[in-house]
Curated annotation (Swiss-Prot):
This is NH(3)-dependent NAD(+) synthetase. SUPFAM superfamilies: Adenine nucleotide alpha hydrolases-like. The gene is nadE. Pfam families: NAD_synthase (PF02540). Its EC number is 6.3.1.5. Mg(2+) binds at residues 49, 156. It comes from Aeropyrum pernix (strain ATCC 700893 / DSM 11879 / JCM 9820 / NBRC 100138 / K1). PANTHER family: GLUTAMINE-DEPENDENT NAD(+) SYNTHETASE, NH 3 /GLUTAMINE-DEPENDENT NAD + SYNTHETASE. GO terms for molecular function: ATP binding; glutaminase activity; metal ion binding; NAD+ synthase (glutamine-hydrolyzing) activity; NAD+ synthase activity. Belongs to the NAD synthetase family. Residues 257-286 are annotated as: Disordered. It catalyses: deamido-NAD(+) + NH4(+) + ATP = AMP + diphosphate + NAD(+) + H(+).
Amino acid sequence: MAVNYKVSLDDVVDIDYNGVRQAITQFLRKYLEASGASGYVLGVSGGVDSSLALALAVDAVGSGRVTALIMPDREVTPERDVEDALRLVRSFGVEHAVIDISPIVMVYISALPIFEDEEKDRVPVGNLRARIRANILYYYANKLGKLVLGTGDRSEYLIGYFTKYGDAACDVAPLTVLYKSQVRRLAELIGVPRDIAYKPSSPRLWKGHEAEAELGLSYNEIDVILYSRFDLKIPWEEIPRATGLERAKVERVRLLHEASSHKRSPPASPDLGEIKKHYKQHAGKK
């Protein structure tokens, strides 16, 4: 496939944000009504994704049906994140609670004989933090009769930048249709303060954790590459020429996508047809 045009971030973000807002809020409203649940519960970190998810949920079903949980770990979460999260939940007028997960994390790692130290176990302990937050969200959802609202975006979904059964655990995922760069613009439009809408992204799974530093390229670059591949259907090998981005960066995104395919799939199991070949015939069947 010969690519005779240039793809830029302008192409990615050139969408009807008011139309997108209406479509997502209508989806959230109808889904909740069909489920019979009483509302939505979500984690709010003070970052752009959870801020937009909160704003859309309130827009869709009203502040009285939304519960926000702020779940810092005092060992790794900057105070500014907690302050930003509190500023948001108060401005949207939703029921909320601040739950420090650090004591829970400490109980886990003190009980695990395989644990060595925070530095050597940085990634598994970081993912443990995400899974603890998911457990708390589902506890609240179960107790309050609500659905867990996911906050991950399409960029993170396609490159697997999330914790399996952690921040990906949810009943509804309204933002997996939007790239990070689109999320930022919609967030600002819907009323999220600009300093939060454009705050550098971080899962805060360990001290000093910054998303773009870990990934090795910016979300703007990631979005242009993903948009080229999955929306414009440009082959991976043609994307450097179409975007002007380094081949190494395109290859990095391709590898992230392919290596994380298991995160976007249900658990693997043996083929049922093969197993049924070994079934015994029912008694009396002729």
